[in-house]
């Protein structure tokens, strides 16, 4: 039982049928036009095989999204919609055989954004914020004297009055680079491609930074709007252990109709996802 409708900003709800089928939606109240809502309303079959992206999420979240009826807030889907459009434009510029490759293996499904059979390169597109981009790139900084020669007028955190002002100089530290679950996701796509007899020499994530150019992004060392970062290879044994365990946990919960344990700290982004971003947080017994 996937999502069944939308939430208005005031909190009341309307079903997909009433909103999109019968056109009873108050567009001005919703603040989002029908064409965008139609994209947000697309659903997958609840009895489908687990997908790579689904297994990256917490098992409890995946279980509730399959078994409970819930309404979605279009405002929380804004960046997801932008990401979908971003993917679609890039896919339209790739050949049919290289873009949106559908894969299946060990009863887990996945869709690869781009596989270049000539260069044997796998690309995954991400529309992300500067915070995540800085983590992926391993951005760090050191302080140096302001090249303008400016000095502090008052003593403070960075220096005493009369001493040269300090400015941040950012650099990439490969040892600090952290792709998080992206590395697991993209490596699983690699494994699935290789299972078809094809080779993958390198993997990259191409990040389009949503807040690129803003002060917040520059304060994290993110100066560009698009970055290409190489994804390190994860050993297949570790990869399969992770995904098989997550697959079995979800399927067992669905079969027994038992709500899984609370998603772990990494899956909930330290609890932030439970507070603001999970579609089924209001249905979760652990929140």
Give the role of each language-model region.
Residues 1-122, 127-164, 180, 194, ...:
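Metal-dependent nuclease catalytic cores that hydrolyze phosphodiester bonds in DNA/RNA
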């Amino acid at each position: 039982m996937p999502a069944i409708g939308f939430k208005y900003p005031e909190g009341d709800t309307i079903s997909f049928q009433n909103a999109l089928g019968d056109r009873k939606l108050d567009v001005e109240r919703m603040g989002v036009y029908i064409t965008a809502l139609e994209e947000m309303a697309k659903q997958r079959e609840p009895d489908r095989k687990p997908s790579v992206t689904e297994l990256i999420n917490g098992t409890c979240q995946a279980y509730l999204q399959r078994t409970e009826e819930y309404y979605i807030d279009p405002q929380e889907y804004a960046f997801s919609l932008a990401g979908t459009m971003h993917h679609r434009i890039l896919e339209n510029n790739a050949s049919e055989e290289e873009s949106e490759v559908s894969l299946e293996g060990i009863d887990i499904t996945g869709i690869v954004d781009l596989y270049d059979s000539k260069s044997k390169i796998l690309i995954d597109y991400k529309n992300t914020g500067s915070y995540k981009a800085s983590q992926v790139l391993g951005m760090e900084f050191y302080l140096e004297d302001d090249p303008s020669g400016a000095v502090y007028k008052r003593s403070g955190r960075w220096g005493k009055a009369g001493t040269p002002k300090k400015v941040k100089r950012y650099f990439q530290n490969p040892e600090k680079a952290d792709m998080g679950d992206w590395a697991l996701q993209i490596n699983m796509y690699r494994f699935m491609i290789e299972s078809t007899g094809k080779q993958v020499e390198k993997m990259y994530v191409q990040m389009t930074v949503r807040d690129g150019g803003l002060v917040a992004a520059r304060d994290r060392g993110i100066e560009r709007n698009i970055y290409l970062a190489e994804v390190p290879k994860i050993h297949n044994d570790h990869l399969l252990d992770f995904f098989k365990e997550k697959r079995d946990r979800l399927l067992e919960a669905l079969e027994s109709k038992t709500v899984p344990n609370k998603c772990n700290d990494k899956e909930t982004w330290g609890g932030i996802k439970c507070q603001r971003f999970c579609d089924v947080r209001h249905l979760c017994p652990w929140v």
